[in-house]
């Protein structure tokens, strides 16, 4: 291979080319990642080689952890939120009781209806006997 002619010259005025620095190779994070991938490849733990069942199990575990965190966040409600929930429940109970009372007033019990029917039939029988 032919060497460039500026190597032979000892001319101080010439700017000698330097090899460019690869920012990816100098990055510490990238080096660590590359090293970890190589180690995993040697051990046979490459991410693309995982069986489908193992991937599904890992996804389920992640989902379960996320769900548990959400539940814990809901359990850690402030005093204000707890008090508001109590008031809301009380209001709902009062509303249900009012609805029940209205239904009872609008729809009398069955025995009251039967008693009214008996009176009417008794009166009708008495009227037919008189006539």
UniProtKB/Swiss-Prot annotation:
The modification N-acetylalanine is found at residue 2. Residues 61-108 form a coiled coil. The modification N6-acetyllysine is found at residue 50. Keywords: Acetylation, Coiled coil. Residues 52-79 have a biased composition (Basic and acidic residues). Residues 1-12 have a biased composition (Acidic residues). The keyword Acetylation applies. Residues 1-79, 99-131 are annotated as: Disordered. Transmembrane segments: none annotated. InterPro entries: FAM107. It holds the Pfam family DUF1151. Belongs to the FAM107 family. This is Protein FAM107B. The gene is FAM107B.
